[in-house]
Amino acid sequence: MVANDELLTKYLARNKKAVLGEIIATIQQEQNEVIRKKPQHNMIVQGAAGSGKTTVAMHRISYILYNYEQEFAPEDFYIVGSNQVLLNYITGVLPELNVYGVSQMTMEQLFVRLLYEDWDKSWQIKPVVKGVTPAVKGTLVWFKELENFCLRYEYRAIPREDVVIEKTGKVLLDRATIARLLKETKDLSRADKISRLTDYLMARLENELSGKYYSYTQPEKQKLKHYYETYFGKREWKGSVAELYEQFLKEEQEKDFTVEVPEGGYDVYDLASMAYLYKRIKEDTVIREAGHVVIDEAQDFGMMAYASLKYCLSKCTYTIMGDVAQNISDRYGLNDWMELRKLMLPGEFDYFGILQKSYRNTVEISEFATDILYHGSFPVYPVEPIIRHGEPVTVKKCVDFTEQVTQAEQIIKAWQSKGLDTIAVVCIDEAEAEKVTAALQGSVDLNTGDAGKWEIGEGVMVLPLKYTKGLEFDAVLIFNA
């Protein structure tokens, strides 16, 4: 499984195809260490662009399935990616490792899955729109607000007064004991709290019914058992989780939080909040989900998503891969790992690793990117490019959009004349990508894929920035940089 850098250099000397399997046979030592960590513990890996993070994650799944087959089956894994384009390529890599049957989904799709029957198929998943709302909803402060909302709801929903048998005046469960039990179970779901309280109450009732001080007829015993079996579960939320979430949002608006009630769809932080509310308030039957979750491009998600995920999938372990230098959502993504490490790596044997060797970029590209990163306010992890030189990064200044398009046409044609095949024109978002595609189509043969989809293949592709994560190209033109 371990290979040397000479073999990697040989691979890199060839023209790249936009595939993840390019270095699949070239795993080296620092990657091998990550792959072989025990799956019973959580792991976060900071990996430089081109360090093989995604490939390593897939190898790790294969390694675990082979070496821990008594504990893990393919259906025990969830692979979570930031977009469907990346997941499509993961789908192509896994069969090369003899891995089949592993569920793959975006973070949004995972939270929808965790809503079970409460997800209405008429609802839409929408992208996060830049602005104040996601900057608020993506934080741990927001998650704490959600926790407090649930505590207030549970306080109203779960009886806390003395539980007394009317016939005898016997106190089965006093309010102090109820308060103690609720404190001991404060992090559990409403259903789990009720289950603990009910078990405790029914044990007291059985003791009372079999006692010698009072005599109960058989019908009285049955009536009392029937009544107290549901005593703590009578005030459950009857509406949908969407209605509960709307109630929460309106309470937050009254507290001067700048958030909007979603209309027509939910973004990842809405879905994370709703999944948490479902698990905490509505769930009455625990459904077994994954045993190990692999998250790729982890820096794209705010802490709120991880706090919700940890609560909803509390029995799972995690492999989390990302690069904080590639966070394109600075107001709600991760610019450093500090908070996530505190949340997800509490155990003594949990692991934080760094993949600093980059196999994708030339020395010139790595140095250019690193120089930009040092102008930021967040930690910069070292990048060690494999010794492979290329042309320096070129910056072209243009006066307007028309000149940008003209320059792009000339650059692309020059690259193609050199035999470069897989070329990406990277735009800030979908709207700009559509505009640039329309402008270039008359003079450049573009690989546009299916209408309405962002797909990767050979040729010249115009892509939104978020869909280029983890992919490799012969040449890249960053439009309107």
What are these regions (language model features)?
Residues 10-124, 468, 476:
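P-loop NTPase Walker
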Residues 12-16, 20, 79, 135, ...:
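Alpha-helix initiation/capping motif
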